Amino acid sequence: MKTLTLAHHGLGRRAHAFYVLTKPRVNALIVFCAVIGMFLAVPDGLPDPLRVFAATVGIACVAGAAAAMNCLIEQQLDARMARTRNRPLPRGELHSVEVLVFAGVLGGFGLSVLYQAVNALTMWLTLATFVGYAVIYTLLLKPRTPQNIVIGGASGAMPPVLGWAAVSGEVTAEALLLFLIIFAWTPPHFWSLALYRTADYARAGLPMLPVTHGAAYTRLSVLLYTCALFGVTLLPFAIRMSGWIYLVAAVTLGLRFVHYAWRLLRDYSDALARRTFRFSIVYLSLLFAALLADHYLRL
């Protein structure tokens, strides 16, 4: 009985380790934005629930596979950083081959679901997003250029486009505008994190902006990109994609984000950078929730 209990406990720990590899909190935001895209793609009424379910499962699986590949590729870097040294691979809880197989099976399953139950366009776009994050960003951009977040942000901005394509079978200007919002949001979001983790990134040898250009330059960049983001978020109202509910939310949230960025520039502290980073996640979630609310409660 004791042996069975220990075996069950060990199996549970390994299952949890694989779960952690998928970066579930990041994945949740990805899926959330994708699902919002699915609902916004339908002018009137609701999208087909089975298609929404299949697309959600497929996108979540491929996103989890991309996260696992990122952990696999960066395991030596993760071991040198306080923020990531407790991930399963640096701790020795899993082997590289296991993670590679896990990512392949999970990603292959997700792509198969998208192709069979959604449409080919969504499958190909999701595959391109996987390659963009796991290969282009992780292998080529992140270790080589301080603009890694800016360029690599394209893959992270894809979820609403994937959701839109899943339901409509096409990529429209409105879908690309959702892409643009997340693309503009990505630099201030990640640079806020990099500001209070500068020593970590320097220790790992990663050329994040605060490491290569200094904290002052990065804080100014956060402010400039946040102001640009504010302007971009007004476009859905300007093109009549969204109405007053969204506009009020976008202005309120945007001014708050700009206020955080301004304070970072003028009165920096690690605690403030951490709060800014956390607020940026809340900001994006509420902004997309406002898009959805406005879609069905248009004023």
From Swiss-Prot:
Any single GO CC term annotated in Swiss-Prot or TrEMBL for this entry: plasma membrane
Function: Converts heme B (protoheme IX) to heme O by substitution of the vinyl group on carbon 2 of heme B porphyrin ring with a hydroxyethyl farnesyl side group.
Organism: Azoarcus sp. (strain BH72)
Entry's EC annotation: 2.5.1.141
Transmembrane parts of this sequence: 26-46, 53-73, 94-114, 121-141, 149-169, 175-195, 217-239, 243-265, 277-297
UniProt key word Repeat: no
GO terms under biological process: heme O biosynthetic process
Catalysed transformations (reactions): heme b + (2E,6E)-farnesyl diphosphate + H2O = Fe(II)-heme o + diphosphate
Transferase among keywords: yes
Similarity-based family: Belongs to the UbiA prenyltransferase family. Protoheme IX farnesyltransferase subfamily.
Top-level division of the source organism's lineage: Bacteria
Enzyme class: transferase
Pathway it works in: Porphyrin-containing compound metabolism; heme O biosynthesis; heme O from protoheme: step 1/1
GO molecular function: protoheme IX farnesyltransferase activity
Entries under HAMAP family matching the protein: CyoE_CtaB (MF_00154)
Keywords on record: Cell inner membrane, Cell membrane, Heme biosynthesis, Membrane, Transferase, Transmembrane, Transmembrane helix
Gene3D superfamilies according to UniProt: UbiA prenyltransferase
Name by which UniProt lists this protein: Protoheme IX farnesyltransferase
InterPro entries: Protohaem_IX_farnesylTrfase, UbiA_prenyltransferase, UbiA_prenylTrfase_CS, UbiA_sf
Membrane topology: Multi-pass membrane protein
Extra remark beyond the main annotation: Carbon 2 of the heme B porphyrin ring is defined according to the Fischer nomenclature.
Subcellular location, record wording: Cell inner membrane
